[in-house]
Amino acid sequence: MALNVFQKQEVVKELAGVATKAYSLIVAEYAGITVSQMTAMRKQARESGVYLKVVKNKLAARALGDTEYAVIKEKLIGPLLYAFSLEDPGAAGRLIKEFSKKHDKLKSKAVSLGGVLYPAGHVDVLASLPTRLQALAMLARVLSEPVTLFARAIKAVADDKSETVAVSAPETSEA
Protein backbone atom coordinates (compact mmCIF):
# COMPACT_ATOMS: atom_id res chain seq x y z
CA MET A 1 0.00 0.00 0.00
CA ALA A 2 1.40 3.36 -1.02
CA LEU A 3 1.71 6.05 1.61
CA ASN A 4 0.37 9.53 1.04
CA VAL A 5 2.43 12.63 1.82
CA PHE A 6 1.08 12.99 5.36
CA GLN A 7 1.77 9.36 6.20
CA LYS A 8 5.30 9.70 4.84
CA GLN A 9 5.85 12.78 7.01
CA GLU A 10 4.67 10.83 10.05
CA VAL A 11 7.04 7.96 9.26
CA VAL A 12 9.96 10.39 8.89
CA LYS A 13 9.02 12.14 12.13
CA GLU A 14 8.70 8.84 14.03
CA LEU A 15 12.00 7.48 12.70
CA ALA A 16 13.82 10.74 13.46
CA GLY A 17 12.44 10.68 17.02
CA VAL A 18 13.63 7.12 17.56
CA ALA A 19 17.04 7.93 16.06
CA THR A 20 17.63 10.78 18.50
CA LYS A 21 17.03 8.44 21.46
CA ALA A 22 18.90 5.40 20.10
CA TYR A 23 22.38 4.30 21.16
CA SER A 24 23.23 2.47 17.93
CA LEU A 25 21.82 1.58 14.53
CA ILE A 26 22.27 -1.52 12.40
CA VAL A 27 21.10 -1.60 8.80
CA ALA A 28 20.51 -5.09 7.38
CA GLU A 29 19.29 -6.64 4.15
CA TYR A 30 16.26 -8.83 4.70
CA ALA A 31 15.43 -10.08 1.18
CA GLY A 32 14.33 -13.71 1.39
CA ILE A 33 13.07 -13.58 4.99
CA THR A 34 9.51 -14.89 5.27
CA VAL A 35 6.71 -13.00 6.97
CA SER A 36 6.62 -15.45 9.88
CA GLN A 37 10.38 -15.13 10.38
CA MET A 38 10.12 -11.32 10.30
CA THR A 39 7.25 -11.45 12.80
CA ALA A 40 9.34 -13.61 15.13
CA MET A 41 12.24 -11.17 14.80
CA ARG A 42 9.99 -8.20 15.58
CA LYS A 43 8.72 -9.97 18.69
CA GLN A 44 12.28 -10.69 19.79
CA ALA A 45 13.18 -7.05 19.09
CA ARG A 46 10.37 -5.72 21.28
CA GLU A 47 11.48 -7.98 24.14
CA SER A 48 15.09 -6.82 23.91
CA GLY A 49 14.47 -3.06 23.59
CA VAL A 50 15.22 -2.77 19.88
CA TYR A 51 13.12 -0.63 17.54
CA LEU A 52 12.89 -2.54 14.27
CA LYS A 53 11.46 -0.86 11.18
CA VAL A 54 11.29 -1.58 7.47
CA VAL A 55 11.00 1.70 5.65
CA LYS A 56 11.80 3.09 2.20
CA ASN A 57 15.40 4.21 1.96
CA LYS A 58 14.48 7.71 0.80
CA LEU A 59 12.29 8.20 3.90
CA ALA A 60 15.02 6.78 6.13
CA ALA A 61 17.59 9.13 4.59
CA ARG A 62 15.34 12.10 5.34
CA ALA A 63 14.66 10.93 8.89
CA LEU A 64 18.33 10.27 9.68
CA GLY A 65 19.58 13.43 7.95
CA ASP A 66 19.69 15.60 11.07
CA THR A 67 20.82 12.90 13.49
CA GLU A 68 24.15 11.29 14.29
CA TYR A 69 23.17 8.45 11.95
CA ALA A 70 23.37 10.64 8.83
CA VAL A 71 26.71 8.92 8.11
CA ILE A 72 24.83 5.78 7.08
CA LYS A 73 23.10 7.40 4.07
CA GLU A 74 25.61 6.03 1.55
CA LYS A 75 24.74 2.44 2.56
CA LEU A 76 20.99 2.79 1.96
CA ILE A 77 20.65 0.63 -1.15
CA GLY A 78 18.18 -2.22 -1.59
CA PRO A 79 15.50 -3.58 0.76
CA LEU A 80 16.70 -2.76 4.27
CA LEU A 81 15.52 -2.98 7.83
CA TYR A 82 16.65 -0.58 10.52
CA ALA A 83 17.39 -1.83 14.03
CA PHE A 84 17.83 0.89 16.66
CA SER A 85 19.12 -0.03 20.14
CA LEU A 86 17.05 1.92 22.63
CA GLU A 87 18.15 0.44 25.97
CA ASP A 88 21.80 -0.49 25.51
CA PRO A 89 24.21 -0.12 22.57
CA GLY A 90 24.64 -3.85 21.93
CA ALA A 91 20.98 -4.92 21.88
CA ALA A 92 20.48 -4.51 18.13
CA GLY A 93 23.80 -6.23 17.46
CA ARG A 94 22.82 -9.22 19.57
CA LEU A 95 19.42 -9.42 17.83
CA ILE A 96 20.82 -9.27 14.29
CA LYS A 97 23.71 -11.62 15.07
CA GLU A 98 21.47 -14.21 16.74
CA PHE A 99 18.82 -14.03 14.04
CA SER A 100 21.31 -14.20 11.15
CA LYS A 101 22.77 -17.42 12.61
CA LYS A 102 19.40 -19.12 12.10
CA HIS A 103 18.46 -17.32 8.87
CA ASP A 104 21.31 -16.76 6.44
CA LYS A 105 19.18 -14.44 4.29
CA LEU A 106 19.52 -11.67 6.88
CA LYS A 107 22.79 -9.86 6.25
CA SER A 108 23.98 -6.82 8.14
CA LYS A 109 25.10 -4.03 5.87
CA ALA A 110 26.36 -1.29 8.18
CA VAL A 111 26.66 -0.30 11.82
CA SER A 112 26.57 3.21 13.24
CA LEU A 113 27.50 4.09 16.80
CA GLY A 114 28.23 7.55 18.13
CA GLY A 115 28.08 9.19 14.71
CA VAL A 116 30.68 6.83 13.22
CA LEU A 117 29.98 4.40 10.38
CA TYR A 118 31.43 0.91 10.80
CA PRO A 119 31.46 -2.00 8.35
CA ALA A 120 28.98 -4.84 8.66
CA GLY A 121 31.54 -7.05 10.41
CA HIS A 122 31.34 -4.83 13.48
CA VAL A 123 27.96 -6.32 14.36
CA ASP A 124 29.89 -9.02 16.27
CA VAL A 125 31.80 -6.36 18.21
CA LEU A 126 28.59 -4.52 19.03
CA ALA A 127 26.88 -7.78 20.02
CA SER A 128 29.70 -8.59 22.44
CA LEU A 129 29.16 -5.41 24.44
CA PRO A 130 27.73 -6.12 27.89
CA THR A 131 24.21 -5.08 28.76
CA ARG A 132 23.75 -2.20 31.17
CA LEU A 133 23.07 -4.62 34.02
CA GLN A 134 26.17 -6.68 33.21
CA ALA A 135 28.31 -3.54 33.00
CA LEU A 136 27.03 -2.33 36.38
CA ALA A 137 27.77 -5.73 37.91
CA MET A 138 31.32 -5.64 36.52
CA LEU A 139 31.78 -2.11 37.87
CA ALA A 140 30.49 -3.12 41.30
CA ARG A 141 32.92 -6.04 41.37
CA VAL A 142 35.85 -3.82 40.40
CA LEU A 143 34.91 -1.25 43.03
CA SER A 144 34.39 -3.83 45.78
CA GLU A 145 37.62 -5.74 45.14
CA PRO A 146 39.97 -3.33 47.02
CA VAL A 147 37.64 -3.31 50.03
CA THR A 148 37.49 -7.10 49.99
CA LEU A 149 41.28 -7.38 49.82
CA PHE A 150 41.64 -4.90 52.68
CA ALA A 151 39.15 -6.85 54.81
CA ARG A 152 41.03 -10.09 54.11
CA ALA A 153 44.33 -8.45 55.11
CA ILE A 154 42.84 -7.16 58.37
CA LYS A 155 41.40 -10.59 59.14
CA ALA A 156 44.74 -12.26 58.39
CA VAL A 157 46.56 -9.86 60.71
CA ALA A 158 43.94 -10.39 63.42
CA ASP A 159 44.15 -14.18 63.05
CA ASP A 160 47.95 -14.03 63.14
CA LYS A 161 47.93 -11.92 66.33
CA SER A 162 45.41 -14.18 68.06
CA GLU A 163 47.60 -17.20 67.31
CA THR A 164 50.68 -15.44 68.70
CA VAL A 165 48.83 -14.34 71.80
CA ALA A 166 47.56 -17.86 72.42
CA VAL A 167 51.03 -19.35 72.02
CA SER A 168 52.91 -16.82 74.14
CA ALA A 169 50.43 -16.56 76.98
CA PRO A 170 52.21 -17.32 80.27
CA GLU A 171 51.05 -20.35 82.11
CA THR A 172 50.17 -19.87 85.72
CA SER A 173 51.07 -22.63 88.04
CA GLU A 174 49.50 -23.06 91.37
CA ALA A 175 51.56 -25.07 93.69
Swiss-Prot record:
One of its GO terms (cellular component) is large ribosomal subunit. GO terms for molecular function: large ribosomal subunit rRNA binding; structural constituent of ribosome. One of its GO terms (biological process) is translation. The keyword Ribonucleoprotein applies. Coiled coil: none annotated. Signal peptide: none annotated. Keywords: Ribonucleoprotein, Ribosomal protein, RNA-binding, rRNA-binding. Gene3D superfamilies: 3.30.70.1730. HAMAP family: Ribosomal_uL10. This is Large ribosomal subunit protein uL10. It comes from Xylella fastidiosa (strain M12). The lineage of its organism: Bacteria, Pseudomonadati, Pseudomonadota, Gammaproteobacteria, Lysobacterales.
